[in-house]
């Protein structure tokens, strides 16, 4: 972790205003922020550091695709909209590409594929922004952000400084990172750099992906993998613009080999995936489906009828409805399998 030399530039002012957040979260939950600011340039970050102590809490938003927002937020909400994508450099074994935190993640992946900067195609169509991606260490179809990560710059809100972090400082794990264990609002990611491998090799660990990416027996290209991932996700997952959702709501639980073997003895159809450390990742969607939750509804919240991992807003849902449904699912899964499901989204407190 190293401090980035301060840039000499004027401090852009921030003037908080009230904001309806219904369109700022993909679950479409009714939420109100009495104090809201949009961060559109790095020079605004010092002003954010000066402003934040006046409020009970600082809530940093990206695309709002991995959050559960309360009806009202007692604090300052800052949405990161920093723009920009550039090729930083290239060497024999990698392209180094940088994207600002406010860039749409899928748009960034598409730009990389279009430019021949291959390696992120398995992560296509994941909602959200570039800045939120390292926080969650997003992953799909055999690739995690950590696999392609180079470094990032983040603003230390209390310290009032830019800090550069490598993979070791970010402490990536399954859907986890350093940032998820810090005080909320302590850091604002400004930009992320990716090391995209040269030569490129496809990652086709999932059977669905193998079938979709095969083109007349020819070796798949990054574009073919990208198209396959998009097709699979569109077939399985609801569009947040049509049905409010936050993508996969639960992490796939990790268990040791003994626990997995005991579960297989009772449930022969158990879906699991071996991990490099000897543990097994259980398919949370399968566990939920087997408990009979797929397609069910509890109040204004429901479980998607094609993907049991996805909780949806059936219209007018609030945070309490989503969390009540999540708790009911967790209880049923734990009673049947002895496994506790952990939610993926950040649940923002009202205060």
From Swiss-Prot:
An annotated Gene Ontology molecular function: UDP-N-acetylmuramate dehydrogenase activity
Gene Ontology biological-process entries: cell division; cell wall organization; peptidoglycan biosynthetic process; regulation of cell shape
SUPFAM superfamilies according to UniProt: FAD-binding/transporter-associated domain-like, Uridine diphospho-N-Acetylenolpyruvylglucosamine reductase, MurB, C-terminal domain
Gene Ontology, cellular component aspect: cytosol
Name of the coding gene: murB
Protein name per the record: UDP-N-acetylenolpyruvoylglucosamine reductase
Function, in words: Cell wall formation.
Alphabetical UniProt keywords: Cell cycle, Cell division, Cell shape, Cell wall biogenesis/degradation, Cytoplasm, FAD, Flavoprotein, NADP, Oxidoreductase, Peptidoglycan synthesis
Places the protein is found: Cytoplasm
Active-site residue numbers: 175, 248 (proton donor), 344
